[in-house]
A protein has these predicted regions:
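Non-globular, low-confidence helical/coil segments that flank catalytic cores
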Residues: 2-290
């Protein structure tokens, strides 16, 4: 193969540098900002040692996980207090009881239009209860998670970053659905109980697409999640940890709290703060009332 002359190589380098500079200029100064009409409200619901997040958009509702079976009464009362009747998308990140324990009650008490799952093989009673509830409510559109799939509730976009069906292993935590929610210029990330191995895969595949304003910390603030390489890619300024008071796992782990403090990331904890509500106006995310 004929080698390129130094002059040609220099021209190529100059072209690449100019292209990169123009791309940066467009992204940061010339591109029209994405504007939205209204706000979305993010409810990190205190379901004890479990997870449940409700996002209310002007055009509909997204629910991610449904806490434990023992907290389902509280979850339903919370949804009722907000006047929730319809859930447009219901994402079950993975079939552990602390994430899907109240899912069957949600399916039986509200109009759920779409449910997103991974079909990770599970023999738990909570998972069986979800399947039974779906059999009774055949009108619900069941969606199997596919990496890169995008769904919308009005101007709010939900992007699934995995896993693909062929990537489900034997670990439910690391088969968690990863969801990025985008509203205007703002974005939020929800990773279920995904741990380091999944975070590394996300950075490898989506490094330039992971930047978010808000992150629900993975695995209840466990040190098995929120790796440095992942946090470097996501760079959130606001986070929430969903965990139970005096839980037996020691969540959130001290290493995680130290990491958040060193990075100057604002964080809230359901075990201490109870239900935590955030607002996203399409430009920034902030705790309601602040």
């Amino acid at each position: 193969m004929k080698k390129l002359s130094p002059k040609v190589r220099n021209i190529i380098v100059i072209v690449l540098v100019v292209a990169a500079a123009l791309s940066y200029l467009y992204d940061n100064y010339l591109r029209e900002p994405v504007t939205v009409d209204g706000e979305i409200v993010i409810h990190s619901i205190d379901v004890g040692q479990g997870d449940s997040t409700l996002i209310m958009a002007p055009e509909g509702n997204l629910l991610i996980d449904a806490g434990t079976g023992s907290s389902e009464g509280y979850l339903l009362a919370y949804l009722d207090s907000l006047g929730i009747e319809t859930i447009d998308y219901f994402i079950l990140t993975h079939p552990h009881e602390d994430h899907i324990g109240g899912a069957d009650a949600v399916l039986e008490n509200y109009e759920v239009k779409n449910i997103v799952m991974t079909f990770f093989t599970s023999t738990s009673n909570a998972y069986d209860a979800v399947l039974d509830a779906l059999k009774k409510n055949v009108y619900i559109n069941v969606i199997e998670c596919e990496e890169g799939a995008e769904y919308y509730i009005g101007e709010m976009k939900m992007t699934l970053l995995g896993p693909n069906p062929d990537e489900l292993g034997d670990d439910a935590n690391n088969s968690s659905i990863i969801t990025k929610v985008t509203y205007g210029e703002s974005s939020l990330m929800f990773t279920g109980d995904a741990e380091y191995v999944v975070e590394a895969r996300l950075v490898s595949r989506f490094r330039n697409e992971l930047d978010c304003d808000f992150l629900k910390l993975g695995h209840h603030g466990s040190s098995t999640s929120s790796s440095d390489v992942f946090m470097d890619a996501v760079t959130p300024y606001l986070t929430v940890i969903s965990c139970g008071e005096d839980n037996s796992y020691g969540h959130p782990h001290r290493e995680i709290l130290s990491m958040l403090q060193k990075r100057n990331i604002e964080y809230y904890r359901t075990d201490r703060d109870g239900d935590v509500v955030f607002v996203c106006d399409g430009e920034k995310v902030y705790k309601k009332g602040e």
